[in-house]
Amino acid sequence: MKKIGIILIIMLVIVFLSTRTGKIEKKSLSGVSKEQAVLEKNKDKYNKHIRFYNRILNIDKGLLYYFEDAGMDKKFKNIQNEEITADIAIDKNFIDKLKELSESKEKKDELDKKAIAMLPVLEKMLPITDEMRTYYKNKQYLQDNYAKAQDLHTQLLATLDKYNQVTKSYKEVFEKKSDEIKKLMIKDYDKRKQYITYNQFMFIEEGDQIIKEIHKQGLDASDFTAKGNAKKFKKLEEKMDKAFIKFEKSIKNTKQLGKEGYNPGDHSEFIQKANKFRQSVNVFIQRIEKKEKASHSSVSDSFFAQTEEGTPENVLANFNEVIKEHNKLLAKKTKK
């Protein structure tokens, strides 16, 4: 199975929600920390780029699924009796948002500039992906024996190098900014003695180190048992488990729960998702140690790999679920 790049980390970014409501005032009047002031200042811009980043990841996912079906070679891989997925999430709305950013008179930082740099190739890809979506949805390939499929495949391939180049640059800058924001949030929760939320963040950070190591080692369902370094993952797993135990202990303090705007039981879904993620990490490490390869279905199709326990894709999918639950808890906390 050929993939775009080494591996696609299709994960949600930790959403940034305002740590306070209302207008930021001087610390002497409102008790707003330096971290809170910086977070509030960056809130709108960061949330906008979260949406851009997630859109790019969705496009990446669509490209991955398409090329798994059609192949990465110049000649389109004609697979009889099998439907091809060509749902590549480039649309006019996303392009308009990038144009709006480009035409804005606000001062542009590096992240803005990297986002704007994606515009030309996305505009070039839009009519191609629109036509592909219609072509495959209406099964027009049955009428022309895949003649148009080859033409569309060639056009899409011609844009791919540029797309990968500009989106990689954007993702790198965004991820750096995201790490800075997360560090500020962690520091802020620690300063304000929001120990439950702080411990939850720390567990997620340790889990994220495992995700980053998967990316660093370049693992996917086709090769993780041959290439994976189990020792490194074991060390990271130990740190994650310690952070999780600390978090679990903190939510038993009902007084602290109330202080942070939570009720007993609010974290039950998060705990369930976190345990599933931890289990998938554990199985992932065991499979590397035992050289237990992924099934043929998972090797040939990343959709199936996400559901086979212990594959890199399955670990990533379960981490996504942890992040989703974390975001729900933050949203609930912010509303109170």
Q: Language model features by range: what are they?
A:
Residues 24-81, 150, 184-208, 212-215, ...:
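Immediate post-signal-peptide N-terminus of mature secreted/exported proteins
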Residues 234-336:
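A cross-kingdom marker for long, charged
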Residues 1-4:
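Positively charged n-region of N-terminal signal peptides that target proteins for export
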Residues 61-144:
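Post-signal peptide N-terminal segment of secreted/secretory-pathway proteins
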Residues 7-18:
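Hydrophobic membrane-insertion alpha-helices, especially the h-region
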Residues 153-277:
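Extended amphipathic alpha-helical interaction segments
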Residues 69-71, 95-109, 138-151, 183, ...:
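Short, charged/polar, low-complexity loop and linker segments
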Residues 34-51, 103-106, 110-117, 144, ...:
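Non-transmembrane, amphipathic alpha-helical segments
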